[in-house]
Amino acid sequence: MEAISGMLPLIVAAPFLGALLPGLMIRAGRDTCTWFTILPTALALLMLVLHAPAVIAGEVFHFRLAWLPALGLNVNFMLDGLGLLFAGLILGIGLLIILYARFYLSREDPMGQFFTYLLLFQGAMVGIVLSDNILLLLIFWELTSLSSFLLIGYWNHLPEGRQGARMALAVTGMGGLAMIGGMLILGNIAGSYDISVILENKEAIQASEWYLTALVLILIGAFTKSAQFPFHFWLPHAMAAPTPVSAYLHSATMVKAGLFLMARLWPVLSGTPEWFYLVATTGLITMVIAAVIALFKDDLKGLLAFSTVSHLGLITMLLGFGTEAAAVVAVFHIINHASFKAALFMTAGIVDHETGTRDIKRLGGLRHLMPVTFVIAAITALSMAGVPPLNGFISKEMMLKETTYAVWAGNPWLMPALATLGALFSVAYSFRYIWHVFMGPVRDDYPKPPHDPGFGMWAGPALLAAIVVLIGVMPWLAEPFVAAVAASVTAAAPEVHLKLWHGVNAALFMSVAAILGGAALLAMHGGLEAVWQRAGPPAAKRIFDALVGGLTAGSRRLTDGLHDASATRYAAILAIATVGAGAIAWTTGEMGMPTREPLPITTLPMIGWVLLVGATATLVAFHRNRLLALVLIGVVGLVVSVQFVYFSAPDLAMTQLSVEVVTIVLLLLALNFLPQTCPQEPLGRKLRDGLLAGAGGLAVAGLAYAMMVRDFAMPSISAFHLENSYKGGGGTNVVNVILVDFRGFDTYGEIIVLGIAALVIFALTDAVIKGPGGRWLANWQSDRPDAGDRHPLMMVVATRVMMPMALLAGIYIFLRGHNEPGGGFIAGLVVAIALLMQYMASGFGWAYERQRVPYHTVIGLGVLVATATGIGAWFNGRPFLTSDFGYFRIPPMNEFELATAMAFDVGVFLAVVGAVMLALASLSSMNRRAGETVNVDPMDINPARAQDAQLEQEA
């Protein structure tokens, strides 16, 4: 039975919105900050609880909102039994962790920052478990990796914290990338990315040839997140985080995300031999290996970390069995593990907080000094060991029973034997947690005088310990909830019978053997530890570090070989790749005969071609002279502009010409500090470069000719633009309509890149001026003779007289651009050239005094205007940057057209002007620092004021 609930997105959004509060409320005090962190969590939990009765009764709630339907990405949420379980754990235990953290964190720890990270992580986890779209789930999945990175590395002053955070991000991030591929394959097989649809296509998915590929990729993501072998090593190193983080992320939330994913997709992926051998085997290996390592860990949190890995392996193994009964046990143990493990982590934090150490060898006898903590720790540790009458005993015995039905490669004894071995070591490390920390005589060398903490720290673990006892003594209370969750996992109605006594059976004997064997192992711990140390404990971190180091070294060698800051090297790589790709296509493909007649060769284009080739050849011959090479580049650009005019492309011609003027002026400023000539290249390098250049040029020429004399295989898009330019964009200048409407998003990206380039120029020049380079500039002597008159009077007068006309020309070009050649980009270049001429003619000091414009702001304003124009289309129900137009009449004027594209063009105009002028100001500042004098000619301003302006600009 399905129902619609508008609360589901609110449950997900509440923690994200609440993350804004702790940082603001910390000024009001730690208690206020804590309450404002509790508020969004409690609100989300309340909304979840309101749905609980209906969900337990079998109802499934949905919320659907189309977001990017063309990509299959929709904001779809689903609340069923499985989602209720995990969301309840995330929010319920989250409340206890927030209260615990209030008293755990010291006053030196930035509490507002901690709670912000915690709520971001909480929201991402709730998003995962309530998502009904695998693409949406992937977004939340990656958000958990990022937010957990911040939480694990919260104590960033500790090297262990930074290393643990990086390791967790690297491992889970790698798994996330693999999982993306698996999810895309899964959605492609099912024909939808909605989870509810995927769950209805079991037969199609398992019959697909891509089933195994999708399964492996998805399991890599799940195994890395849930720390399964061989990816288990990151979780213990994440214990460098504060204990509230460990208790939250590594008992009930982050490490359970992989289990959730396997449980969510269990109906369509399980039941095959591939699923059994991959999942059950991995879980069993993880369970045993981690349990063995945990026994020999002397760090309290390290012991609990490996115990967590072991229990996650246990649950993974149960899910891998692929039976409904095993799925029921997995669900039940998820609940039990979350309750006792969160409490154990918090008691470990209490011990560390009150004694000053987590080293088990420095502890002991704490039952007399910390009786409340001892009771809580004893109850929860005994539950972890599987001792009756606690909840851990029930799920452990049910697990052992399920292993007796599992046959691995024809062997019915292997899995029960190894599972019993894992349970035996689980008992041993659980008993060690109690015996070596709390039992024995009181010591006199504790780092701090131990005592029980205040109520705020032990209230949370005490509540969880009470749940451990309650479920253990009265397990039938949990039956309806476990049944609802198991029904969601199995897509069936499995029978659920939870009871403390299951009778005398094989599972009971296995359980007794585990308890007795675990006690015996603890008694022999000293001797076993000596053997363990001599054997050399496994150190997966060394393998991981070696792997990462090898990859880093290899990438560095590759980067050094390809990326050496040499434009020649980059051009060579591009030429080789282009020629190689073209050669492969030419030799393996098929090309039809020419279908078009080339245009006849006439005198004018021939002259242009000769000039172009001549200028290029001269440039190659005299390229060592930097100034001459720059002039020849300008000649090449001018000839290209004329060719554009000849071929009826006035927009391109004006743009090309304007760009040539701007770039030459800026390059002249940049070349001022370089030697007049380039170094002489060896003959071998010249021959190599000439060969590559010739091959690249011939390849491009051949491709261009082949395209010009043949019709396109697909219909040309030109007809669409010509037909829809006026109807869709309201303009007859097709080029401009393409820039501001059809391909407006490209233009939007280009102005952002242009702005970033200008800001980079500013940042680099500013760093040079304020750094050691500033002293070099102050002592720099030019190797070129100075001009007799830096600012000729004739040029000064001409530029000032032409300034208004140039600005009017820019405005005219801007306004006519939608229907005639022009537009915001060209107009911006024209206005920038007009301003450049003022700086060139009268000097920076004179121009800056009269044009105090913050060009950073101009760039930002241009991008904001363009962005606002694009967003405005949303309010009209259209995609981003879709323009609209209409006709208006204001008497006595004639009817005229207004288009929203004009506002976008304003943004382009501002961004272009700001970028050019900021680059000019940045480069000219280096010349002024190098000792260039401010213009003191009669038409100049007061020299003192000009000097002040110069000093202010340099400051």
Say what each PLM segment does:
Residues 2-4, 66-85, 201-215, 402-416, ...:
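Short aromatic-rich membrane-water interface segments that cap or initiate transmembrane helices
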Residues 59-125, 260, 280, 571-572, ...:
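Hydrophobic alpha-helical transmembrane segments in multi-pass integral membrane proteins
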Residues 88-89, 136-141, 172-173, 212-221, ...:
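Alpha-helical transmembrane segments
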Residues 96-137, 146-452, 473, 584, ...:
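Hydrophobic transmembrane alpha-helices and their helix-loop junctions in integral membrane proteins
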Residues 367-373, 426, 430-518, 527-558, ...:
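Cytoplasmic/organellar membrane-interface segments at the starts of transmembrane helices
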